[in-house]
Amino acid sequence: MNIRRKYGVHGRMVLNHEKIGGEKVIYTLESPWNPNKDEPNGILGLSCVAPGNYNISIEQSPLNKRYYPFLVNESKNVCLKSKVKAHDKTGHAFVDYESFNSLEIYGRFILCGTSYKFDPKGYYAPVYGEEAVSIIKAYIEATGDKSLTISWI
C-alpha cells in the first residue's frame, strides 16, 4: 500500500483487490504540523507523519471498542501503544471525519474517506470515512499486506 502526497497534508492511497470490489481510492488528511529541529513547535501545513515505510496494526480503541488501522514504525519513533522515549509518538490511526472524536482513540490520527469535500475552515476533508476504514481493513484481510509507504508525488 502507498499514500502518495501532492501537498503538505493531503494524500491518496489506491488499493486494488477483487475482495474489495476492484480498485478503490482512499483520500487522506494528516495532522498539519511537523516538529523538527528548526521549528520545535512544528511547521503548519506540513504533515506530522514522516515519509517512509510503516507497518499497519489493527487495534481496538479502549474507549469506543471500534477497531482502527494504526501506522507504526518504531525507527521513526511512532510506537503503537507505549512511548519508550519522551519524544515518541503513538501510532497514527486511520479514522473517519464524520464521526471522529479525538477523545475516542488513543494516539494520533489520519482522517480518511472514499471521497472529499471542501470544508469552510479552508481545507479538503475526506468523506465516507467509515467506508474507507472498512476498505482498508478488508484489503489487509484479503491480501495480508500490512505495510504502507508514504511518499511525495
Language-model segments: residues:
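Cell wall/extracellular polymer interaction/catalysis modules
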Residues: M1-V127, E131-K146, I153
